[in-house]
Amino acid sequence: MVQCSNNLLGILNFFTFLLSIPILSAGIWLGKNAATECERFLDKPMVVLGIFLMFVSIAGLVGACCRVSCLLWLYLFAMFLLILLGFCFTIFAFAVTNRGAGEVISDRGYKEYHVADYSNWLQKRVNNAKNWERIRSCLMYSDVCSTYRTRYASINVEDFYKSNLNALQSGCCKPSNDCNFTYVNPTTWTKTPGPYKNEDCNVWDNKPGTLCYDCEACKAGLLDNIKNSWKKVAKVNIVFLIFLIIVYSVGCCAFRNNRKRSW
């Protein structure tokens, strides 16, 4: 049992070390070669994660295989913090994604979205001008609206209104249903005389670099995407936490065995 727990911990940490190499390499590569704010946004978290996994796995590997109790203690402490952070993140993710859903529009195949329907924490993220400028840049360089424009370019207005658009397409690539603009094609609409009850109608522009990227509906569409993504991540994180707890338990056995051998 003594040898088994140490060997198992060594094997698990060897694979974790191998995993850290491509994560760290990808983060460094993104930092040097990123073409957009979207890509640059990911480089630092990936570098930090890669370095953390590398050092923790080395500590666990050496501590288990060479029976160095102080390294195993540091490893277990880091693992405990990781489990605690993962647990807190999972609770937080479920808490901030428990609100928000698209509004069903009569005679429309798509929904429309409103920032006020989502949690206050998420609202603050998109209402921050600096944050939104970076996100807006990401959306412009992505294929969200270009794919939407290509896919629906040849359909008439009746078929367009029946289209099942996703949250970003509905919020960022077309004007709000409240505007009652005249349809020309998916990204070209003729404005009707104001005033408008929805401020997004004033923001809309047919220019490909503008569209509705600064609309509240676009922010809400992004929040709906984040909400759905975070719920999926939180569910996966539960499985990951179970795995970490198992590894932590094996580490505790190895640490206890090392202490017994030293006595």
Curated annotation (Swiss-Prot):
InterPro entries the UniProt entry points to: TET_plant, Tetraspanin/Peripherin, Tetraspanin_CS
GO CC terms, sorted: membrane; plasmodesma
Coiled-coil stretches: none
Extracellular side stretches: 29-45, 97-234
Record flagged with keyword Membrane: yes
Glycosylation sites: 180
Record's subcellular location: Membrane
Membrane topology: Multi-pass membrane protein
Superkingdom, natural source: Eukaryota
Alphabetized UniProt keyword annotations: Glycoprotein, Membrane, Transmembrane, Transmembrane helix
GO biological process: auxin-activated signaling pathway
Side Cytoplasmic, residues: 1-7, 67-75, 256-263
Chain ranges passing through the membrane: 8-28, 46-66, 76-96, 235-255
Functional description taken from the UniProt entry: May be involved in the regulation of cell differentiation.
Family note: Belongs to the tetraspanin (TM4SF) family.
Name of the protein described by the UniProt record: Tetraspanin-7
Organism (species): Arabidopsis thaliana
